[in-house]
């Protein structure tokens, strides 16, 4: 038992001390000493609360230790980075943003470059000493608008930047912005989605988000011993939870996929444990949980998935999550199969989910074990093969049913790079998946804003007039 234990009915507490970094070795030692003292006292207070709570709380279903000290590791890797020309990036984004001018639908846009580059240092009292490179750069843009009925529409794209060579050209960026504007206009004129359960294809990147949201948080090991957790998969080890042609591996040691840099890559986790691949599902059967240094029944040690953002205590988190299929068809064949399913079920149409912005999933025991995902680009596909944009569609369902509805996969694996939030903060993640055909999925209407669009025309709708 230690101070990291979840108290029944309460959120996880953090025992972290922050301090400004001074110049000079002696000054740094004093600041570090003071911060350590504050953290120790906070942890002692937390342990007292845990001990008191343990006297009155009901017996835990899993009484595994709260923490097991990881083995000692010593590792140092220096990385020399080629500087990225920030003026070039600024000029690139300014020039690309001009493509938005004159568009009557756009109410707002953003063109952003972010970068985290350097080295991460890790020390613990057990003797672990680590220095590992971190290189996360990203160019992202977004354009958005709003219908008179309050419906919000958006499109965008992002590019992961790890070197000057990975910066997209102006021609590429402008072409993508123009494509996004065309999609935004199509969504503006598209009909509203209607509630329906029908066959659907989740395109590769969208399927990556689907796996991450629906399965990922439910197989994070530390959650399995939290009494307030829904435990969808806790007792499913060794059982079939999806079709036998599917496997899921989380492998944070993967730095690239098809020359695409993976944001979820790391060499050591935030508890000093070497990253390692973990087979979560093998041939449809649940095999493992993602583990940090907080053991659970049957999983006494970490498998290198303890992750956190600065100022948070690590818990088990995803890294690079990959859905692997042993039976694939071409994407064209997958669309033909979708149309056949629509006809077979007598549905007016099916769906192609091109893009997902994210969503949320309920994992607490007091709530239904459901999910809600927010597509940003959806097509209706009619029995004759005709496609039509539709807006305002949300995907809802439950994990066990949804995975059982997978019928087939394509051979078009692609990467979703993003950030994932949980109690240990926001961490970079990647998901790799092929496009997938679902026998059915439930679509419901998206909530709309109650406010009207602006009364005056947007400045974006006005042509460029120089710097006057």
Explain the meaning of each model-derived region:
Residues 1-268, 273, 277, 282-285, ...:
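Active-site bordering "gate/hinge" segments
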Residues 225, 236-468:
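Dual-mode signal for accessory low-complexity, basic/Gly-rich regions
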